[in-house]
Each structure stands twice: as structure tokens, then as C-alpha cells.
């Protein structure tokens, strides 16, 4: 049985911490929160410390931050309805671009695998796709109004230019660029949750997605592509996503975040009951009927809601979390 071992507890932000994001190299991370500031932390020896505080980019709470795949840029999504792009090209972090267009709070931001596209989503129910048009130039490529409520999260597929979004309307939607006319279309709607879908994450290959919800469940979805050997029909030659597993009974409140480790296959959740839980696919799991077990849980990981969890992309088994309690914690799963 694996255990979750606490390695570091870090403080610095004032108020609740909404987001944490590992740098692709895994030796730096960024955090953001209610204090309108971004902190960039780095590891020196065995000590994590704040190297930079970026406090002049936003007028309201910063909800989420994400590093570009190349690690040169940091995007921040804020309740002030803007997304800021930061880079260190001059040696110090500077805000190089501010993306405007959403009518309300921006809830999430995500870079495509190539770094050539950026997605944002908002309480205004829309998902925007931006093209990186050159140095610090971003052009709106699409405004997608497929959701009927607040959109909570956007995440790009790990190998293709497919975007997934999760919403207060209880659904997840998939978007892809049409091969006919370069318009972005909604290619799938994933319906099974009975309340807000707070977060989503793809597995390493991108053929499966995990979602977490206000309904206290985790769901695993699988893509069935045209010509699949399971005999699943694919109308219009579009991939069909089916819910193949539901995990319930482990969480006592809303699950706010989920992270699927690309290195180990473990799934971590951050919950409104202050806990962090780790799930592992069982050895006898079937492709079309997968089974997962709870590997370990830290029921009181934080003193208040756990807002975000993310596996380190470079260090297997290392997890970061942040909370309304104003702390960031770094954990290690001991197998």
C-alpha cells in the first residue's frame, strides 16, 4: 500500500491559494491566489523558496496559471476578465501581453502541446482559442459558445490539437479544428455527471480522460475512434467518448481538482473535504471496463478546501497541492 508523505509546507501568499503549476522541468513551480500575485518558486538544495513575485498583472484574484511547454512563458487567468502572458526573455519576468475579450472572470488557461495555441474559459460561458502569432502576439482564432453555463476548466490533449472543457452545466465538451474550413467545432459532449464538472485531465496517451465533479464522483472516459474494434458507432467519423468507470464513495464533498500522472498512471484528487486521495488502476483492469482502487488518502491534507493538485511532470510520484488555508504542500507517493 502506498503512502503519501509530506515533504514541504510552503507559505507566502495572503489568503486562499487557487492554483499551482509545475514548470516542465519539474524544478520550478508557480502559484497564484486571492492576493492577485503570482509567486515563482525554485528548489535550491532541499529548500523551496520564492524567487519572483509578480503582482502588477491583475486587478483581481488570479484563478489559474500554466507554463508553456517550452517553459519560457507563463499564462495567468484572472477574475479581472483578462489573461496575462509573462516571459523572462529580458532576464526578469515581465507581462508581455494581456488577452482581453471575456466578459467575466477567466477561470482557466491551457497551452497546446506545441505551444502554438492557448485556450481560456470564463464565467461568461465561452471558451476562447488564441493563436500565438509571433513574439508576444496573440490572435483570437475562435470563440466557442457550446456550454450553457460557467466554464470551469480547459485542458489540451497531450498529442493532438483537441481541447476539452468542463462546465457548471454538468458536461465536458471536446473541440477540434474542422478539416474543411479551419473553424473550431464541438466534436463531442460527455454527459454523465449530475452536477458541476470542476476539473478534467487526460492520461499520457490522450485516449482516456478523468473528470471530477460537485457530485463527489470521479469518472473515467475512453475515446472510441472510427473503425474501433469494440464495435462502438462513430457518427460523422468523429471519435466518441464513453464513460467506462465511475468512482464514488471515497469523497464526502465536491472534488475540485484531478491530475492524471503521465509518468506513473496514478490519479490524484483535491477535495472540498480537505483531503487528497490517490487512485491506481488495478492489475486486472479491462480496456473497456477499467477498474481503479484507492491507493492511499490523506484525509486532512489541508485545513480547508484543496483547490488544486498537480503531479510533477519530471519527478515520478511527486505531487503539489494548494488550499484555501493559504499553504502549498509538496508530497511524495511512497510505493
Swiss-Prot record:
One of its GO terms (cellular component) is cytosolic [4Fe-4S] assembly targeting complex. GO terms for biological process: iron-sulfur cluster assembly; protein maturation. Keywords: Repeat, WD repeat. InterPro entries: CIAO1/Cia1 (IPR028608), G-protein_beta_WD-40_rep (IPR020472), WD40/YVTN_repeat-like_dom_sf (IPR015943), WD40_repeat_CS (IPR019775), WD40_repeat_dom_sf (IPR036322), WD40_rpt (IPR001680). WD repeats lie at residues 12-51, 57-96, 101-140, 146-185, 192-231, 250-289, 301-335. SMART domains: WD40. Belongs to the WD repeat CIA1 family. PANTHER family: CYTOSOLIC IRON-SULFUR PROTEIN ASSEMBLY PROTEIN CIAO1-RELATED, WD40 PROTEIN CIAO1. Essential component of the cytosolic iron-sulfur (Fe/S) protein assembly machinery. Required for the maturation of extramitochondrial Fe/S proteins. This is Probable cytosolic iron-sulfur protein assembly protein Ciao1. It comes from Drosophila pseudoobscura pseudoobscura. The gene is Ciao1.
